[in-house]
Amino acid sequence: MRFKKCLTALIVLSSVFMTFADEEERVLRLKIGDKNLKDKTMEVSADTIYSAEKGQPIPFADMIQEMAASRFIYVGETHNSFPMHQIQAKIISALYEQDRNLSVGLEMYPVTCQEILNRWSLGILPECEFIRTGHWYVNWNYNFGYYQKIFQFAKEKSLPMYGLNAPRDLISQIRMKGWEALSGEEKEMVPQPDLSHQEHRSLIRTIFESTHLPPQMKGRGLEMAFEGLYRAQSAWDETMAFYALKALEKEDGKMVVLAGSGHLLYNLGLNRRAFEKSRLPFKTVVCVAIPKDKQTIEVSRSLADYVWGIPEEEKPVFPSVGLSFKKINGLENLVVDKKPVDGVAKDGNFEKGDVVLSVDGKAFNDINELRIYLAHFNWEDEAKFLVLRDAEEIQVALKFVAEKNEKEKP
């Protein structure tokens, strides 16, 4: 994890990539959460599911059976971990066989995009049109290929899918100025987040402090950054809990909620908030990646109801570009929003304010369209940008080369 700006850290926190640098490993062994389990630990190995209650391995079928009485099943993810999304798809499929009255809640989409999700579940849209009209690459920063199996299953079985998130600009306002700064209409969309839960605050602070911070963030600036981050993280959790409950009012069965693990750890995030409001039973599954040089890692038994160990990947299946773009009034071309600090673009010659004239000879004036184009590149490919910088046209090569032991890069 790393911290460049509060919003960047917020994106990182929403997924919490479960690999085990020393400064991050302690996140998994905190004595918080379930009072009966928080002082106990268990050793987790790859390709094995563990029951926190029992402190030992559990067969997949038994785990699914134990979920029968739950109304919410929360399955955490690292957004660019293909194995974790395969696990999500497997759980959804098994729960569907158990009870076909099933729906899926998504961190990936804001509630304002519900109509496009309805059309997808009804089988009206082909995939390419869904990605385009649903603005997948504007709402979400990750390759649709990670989620393809999940979405295709939902479409085939006509499973209702619900966007649970708030529009990003509202979360940014809360981060900078607090919930009170929202308009009356905006407050109706984003419920006021409870900031008083000390164990949740301790969890987010531990994740925050495990991030490599630049020197200028030390001292008073560090505390201000954390408070803004915590407001935003809490608002995200509160909003997703609110809309998950609202969606389930329309459904008689259970809902599988797919969200970054940072929203679910120790059952203190959106899962806790939804339970406190409804008392509806739930289960949480969190995956942890086991490094190649370790047989097991030690985690707190209060981390989640089920902990699923998976082998650490050498690199993500799909390259992360790391470029953000914006539109400027009066200019048709897209503009590089900030100098890239991660993804394959980090090592390219891109600068904030570069005007994108073309990519591989093609002009783009829509952010989603450019991201759709870039999403088709594989490792070792190369895209050629022509940008305008200081009134000079410059060729910039975007090389899709993985770093050694590349971790998640939002």
Regions found by a protein language model. Name each.
Residues G55-Y96:
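Zymogen propeptides
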Residues H79-G105, V111-L122:
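Membrane-embedded segments
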Residues I297-V341, H376, Q395-P410:
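PDZ/PDZ-like peptide-tail recognition elements
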Residues Q98, L102-S103, E115-L245, E249:
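A substrate-binding/cap region within the structured catalytic cores of diverse enzymes
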Residues F20-S70:
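N- or domain-start disorder-to-order transition segments that initiate the globular core
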Residues V12-T19:
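Hydrophobic h-region of N-terminal signal peptides that target proteins for export
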Residues E351, L357, I372-P410:
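PDZ-domain C-terminal substructure recognizer with occasional recognition of PDZ-binding tails
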